[in-house]
Amino acid sequence: MKMKSILTLLLTSLLAASGLHAAKKNTPVWTSLDAANIPVSVKIQGEYLGQINGGGKIGAQVIALGGDNYQAVMLPGGLPGAGWDGKNKILLDGSKKDGGLLFHSTNGKGKGYLQEDPARFSATRKNPPNGNKAYSGVISEGALQGKTDDGKSFELRRVIRTSPTLGMKPPKDAKVLFDGTSKAAFQGGRLDEKTKLLNTDGRDIRTVDKLSNYQMHVEFMLPYRPDARGQGRGNSGFYQVDMYEVQILDSF
């Protein structure tokens, strides 16, 4: 009988920005939330969840586009994997005006999928997307408040969803490939003594042991690169048995 091994990889990698829709070389990038100059938009980008007054649940994903520009994707029913109907989206363009962060509906005219110019950016390939409506809103103090096309009010609060396995301890007899103290289990790579992260420096690294039957636990971080688009915002991954890639991207 072939024995099944349990492989736990506690890998916290800073992911390189590359691939399609690559960012310009001078696009600013942050790799720590503690950076002194990280823009306030990092606290605005994210997922929001709430209720339409007299209606159902609604979610939103707010995308920072650089500077004071944003786009909100409103999702009827809730967030992806947690209530969204999987079909309909409502796009709102956002920018700072008179000290507030205001959002208004877009009809899709002049828009293009993942365009670099925030005024032309669309998070959806189809413009306008299915279910698009004339919503409006404002973000303040972690809340997205606004009105639907028929005048109903809504309020969404910023939420941070986490995996139930985040921070999971390795099972008994698991092989820990990386825990922030040593890179001995890898051929190549660099251990950053300050951050305790395993860095690939843009090169492939491989495990010393050749493994083929396992369960993998991976933890990772993404850079913050709001001026970039598509995979340029953060793109990396790892290969299982040197063949099947698990790609890790900025989910927005």
Segments (PLM) and residue ranges:
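Bacterial N-terminal signal peptides that target proteins for export
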Residues: 1-9
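A common structural microfeature
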Residues: 45, 57-59, 69, 211-217, ...
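Residue-level recognition of well-ordered beta-strand positions that form the cores
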Residues: 49-51, 73, 217-221
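A short hydrophobic beta-strand element
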Residues: 48, 70-72, 103
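Carbohydrate-interacting regions of secretory-pathway proteins
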Residues: 22-25, 79-252
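Bacterial N-terminal signal peptides
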Residues: 8-17
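N-terminal glycine/threonine-rich, aromatic-flanked beta-hairpin/loop signature
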Residues: 52-96
